[in-house]
From Swiss-Prot:
Name of the protein this chain belongs to: Dipeptidyl peptidase 4
GO biological process, one term: proteolysis
Subcellular location: Secreted
Function, in words: Extracellular dipeptidyl-peptidase which removes N-terminal dipeptides sequentially from polypeptides having unsubstituted N-termini provided that the penultimate residue is proline. Contributes to pathogenicity.
Cited InterPro entries: AB_hydrolase_fold, Pept_S9_AS, Peptidase_S9_cat, Peptidase_S9B_N, Serine_Prot_S9B/DPPIV
Family: Belongs to the peptidase S9B family.
Catalyzed reactions per annotation: Release of an N-terminal dipeptide, Xaa-Yaa-|-Zaa-, from a polypeptide, preferentially when Yaa is Pro, provided Zaa is neither Pro nor hydroxyproline
Keyword GTP-binding appears in the UniProt entry: no
């Protein structure tokens, strides 16, 4: 797979050139990727190893599982190992496990039942490794525990059941809260906080010394309820009356859940409500909680106003219960992302600091902030962005992180000293590549993961020497050999420049047997949401996009374009879409389509666009422009009107309806001419059990188009019974991708001009579809 292909863009594009390396998947064989190899998920894909590092006196230790299921304590450097849990002590059918910090016990989750994107219910058991005894966390548990977590320093477990918080300690359980129920959540988030704020299933945090627990309480009283019917409900025979799931789901401008901040003394079970005054109760979102001490002296929370364009970091002194705003920011030029990146680092030149990422300068960078408030210290700077903090080594005074310093599509690993501010690459940062790393508990070792664009691999390094690996962890040599049997799509990365001066990143896939003298259909595949990124130097998944590029009967060229509003190109580029989602993004997709048509090989009669979720919304908004460039489109699980989506996501970018009524009206898909004038077809796909983007969006969109005069030969709506946002219920994804494949095949076969019809056929079509049949 040459990573620079025949662009033939006549100077309109600037290539992003990765180096040629021996591990580049150049193919060289004659096999073409098949449908079954790519759909519904890629079967030819790289392997990777994820280690559960253990914090112990000896660095570089981790837990692995042997072939027979036993849990092994291994030292990655010395290759020594010790069996901690024999195979016959491992519960059958377990879902996950967590070791007690001193390795004397294991907490097991069994009887897994999925709830939302991250949350689930389960039974939990504690295995005493020395005694070999297995004890239920709760004697009467019935697969109903929502979350459980070991304390970092003692024998305690905090867990949540029926939305109430409990503390287990050496076999004894203390119920901490008594008010948990359908509308009150203690220590776990409700739906909207799980989905849009934390991206996780817990809302409790032990202090580093294990003596205190900070947790949040959410109150959904008054939050409107959305009802989702489940027609089959996983039954062989559908119930006469569908099961109805009622979710407190705050839509735009509706009442949000309120949130309270609490502290619990583990030893005394004394619980304290800390007043939150950063913003009024109905204008408050708590986005992050972090302990700002090595013991339990200070804890902080990140507070946003409702529309998340103002931020306050509030420190709470645990003993006095006093609160203080130690940092605040006005981000009304756009929005403020919740990066969940606060981390205590301790004393620096006589003052206590924590580290955080902020894009207040216009670019996301690492700063040191005084725990008690005061002027920040910038550790990184420049017109590039820090993506994530990987590890803080307080002994060496180093922060390890990934960034886009080379290019917005790349990731390289660096360290920066918060003593000297010297920044050091741990990889070759002069190549177009995509790296991340996983550091051992004490930071002495790390697994470097090269993730693309060539065949991924993983190597072990010592932080004392980033030049020479200690060993290879995952080679993917078998994948490299297998790829030699194939002719693969030709992938290239480049930029196109907008008339306004911004550049857009593009990922292009050309058919394996590409001939510049032939005509090819083109499919655009955007996501395009705020802060997202699709165009990156990460491994090119051999998925549906690669399939439609490879199949000789399809041979689509695909373009993935990251429009304005997407991530890692600075705050100005991101914030351009604020208060008008779908407007600039659609303009950029249209501009890119006009650019692709400057290539002689691009077939102007067969230019499609397909996206899922926000990409489905963007597909509809792009067709709505009536540009005449796109000839067909597919929206999978789309938002069609952001007034129908949840408040905490939408208002971050659009504000409330009261503040931006005209913006919401324009953002909704409401103009039908672009759909009526399509040369080809428009397909909508949606799961009826989608708890994220409700099926209501597809129903409203379909109705808007039908009532607006879009004829039946132009529009198909496909629902998937009981499927969620990922369309996975009852093999629905299999049907979904077959339908997608048929759609792109039919559109390629569609002729620009309809064949002559008998007068009788014309009369029938005129009666069915209106005047268009007479054209």
């Amino acid at each position: 797979m040459k990573l620079l292909s025949l662009l033939m863009l006549a100077g309109i594009a600037q290539a992003i050139v990765p180096p040629r390396e021996p591990r580049s998947p150049t193919g060289g064989g004659n096999k073409l990727l098949t449908y079954k190899e790519c759909v519904p998920r890629a079967t030819i894909s790289p392997r990777s190893t994820s280690l559960a590092w253990i914090n112990s006196e000896e660095d570089g230790r981790y837990i692995s599982q042997s072939d027979d299921g036993a849990l092994i304590l291994q030292n990655i450097v010395t290759n020594t190992n010790k069996t901690l849990v024999a195979a016959d002590k491992v519960p059958k059918g377990y879902y996950d496990y967590w070791f007690k910090p001193d390795l004397s016990a294991v907490l097991w989750a069994t009887n897994y039942t999925k709830q939302y994107r991250h949350s689930y219910f389960a039974n939990y058991f504690i295995l005493d490794i020395k005694k070999g005894s297995l004890t239920p966390l709760a004697q009467d548990q019935a697969g109903d525990i929502q979350y459980a977590q070991w304390s970092p320093m003692n024998n305690s477990i905090a867990y949540v059941r029926x939305n109430d918080l409990y503390i287990w300690n050496n076999g004894k359980t203390k119920r901490i809260t008594e008010n948990g129920g359908p509308d009150i959540f203690n220590g776990v988030p409700d739906w909207v906080y799980e989905e849009e704020i934390f991206g996780d299933r817990f809302a409790l945090w032990f202090s580093p010394d294990g003596e205190y627990l900070a947790y949040l309480r959410f109150n959904e009283t008054g939050v409107p309820t959305y009802t989702i019917p489940y027609y089959k409900n996983k039954q062989k025979i559908a119930p006469a009356y569908p099961r109805e799931l009622e979710i407190r789901y705050p839509k735009v401008s509706a009442k949000n859940p309120t949130v309270q901040f609490h502290l619990l003394n583990i030893a005394s079970s004394q619980e304290t409500t800390i007043p939150v005054t950063a913003f009024p109760e109905n204008d408050l979102v708590i986005g992050e909680v972090a302990w700002l001490s090595s013991g339990h002296d200070s804890v902080a929370y990140r507070a946003f106003n409702r529309v998340q364009d103002r931020e306050k970091i509030v420190s709470v002194k645990v003993e006095s219960k006093e609160s203080k705003v130690i940092r605040e920011r006005d981000g009304t030029d756009g929005w403020i992302d919740n990066l969940l990146s606060m981390s205590y680092i301790g004393n620096v030149n006589g003052k206590e600091y924590y580290v955080d990422i902020s894009d207040a300068s216009g670019w996301a960078h690492i700063y040191l902030y005084p725990v008690d408030g005061g002027k920040e210290i910038a550790l990184t700077k420049g017109e590039w962005e820090v993506v994530a903090i990987l590890k803080v080594d307080t002994k060496k005074k180093l922060i390890y992180f990934t960034s886009t310093k080379y290019h917005s599509t790349t990731r390289h690993v660096y360290s920066v000293s918060y003593d000297t501010k010297v920044m050091t690459p741990l990889v070759n940062d002069k190549e177009a590549a995509y790296y991340t790393a996983s550091f051992s508990a004490k930071g002495g070792y790390y697994i470097l993961s090269y993730q693309g664009p060539n065949v991924p691999y993983q190597e072990l390094y010592s932080t004392k020497d980033s030049k020479k690996p200690l060993k290879t962890i995952t080679s993917n040599d078998a994948l490299l050999e297998k790829l030699k049997e194939y002719k693969l799509p030709k992938v290239s990365f480049f930029e196109i420049k907008l008339p306004s001066g911004e550049t857009l990143n593009v990922k292009q896939r050309l058919p394996p047997n590409f001939n510049p003298h032939k005509k090819y259909p083109v499919l655009f595949t955007p996501y395009g949401g705020p802060g997202a990124q699709e165009v990156s130097q990460a491994w090119n998944s051999l998925d549906f996009k690669s399939y439609i590029t490879s199949d000789p009967e399809l041979e689509y060229v695909t373009w993935t374009v990251d429009n304005r509003g997407t991530g890692y190109k600075g705050r100005k580029f991101r914030s351009a879409v604020a208060k008008r989602l779908g407007f600039l993004e659609a303009q950029d997709q249209v501009f890119a389509a006009k650019e692709v048509l400057k290539n002689r090989w691009a077939d102007k009669d067969h230019i499609g666009i397909w996206g899922x979720s926000y990409g489905g919304f963007l597909t509809a908004k792009t067709l709505e422009t009536d540009s005449g460039v796109f000839t067909f489109g597919i929206s999978t699980a789309p938002v069609s009107d952001f007034r129908l989506y949840d408040s905490m996501y939408t208002e971050r970018y659009m504000k409330t309806v009261e503040l931006n009524a005209d913006g919401y009206s324009e953002t909704a898909v409401h103009k039908v001419d672009g759909f009526k004038n399509l040369k080809g077809h428009y397909l909508i796909q949606h799961g009826t059990g989608d708890d994220n983007v409700h099926f209501q969006n597809a129903a409203v969109l379909s109705n808007t188009l039908m009532n607006g005069g879009v004829t039946a030969d132009k529009l198909t709506t496909q629902w998937f019974t009981d499927s969620d946002h990922g369309i996975r219920y009852d093999m629905d994804s299999t049907y979904q991708y077959k339908q997608l494949s048929k759609m792109v095949y039919d559109q390629k076969q569609r002729r620009p001009e309809s064949p002559p019809m008998h007068q009788w056929s014309k009369r029938v079509l005129a009666a069915l579809f209106g005047e268009r049949a007479e054209e």
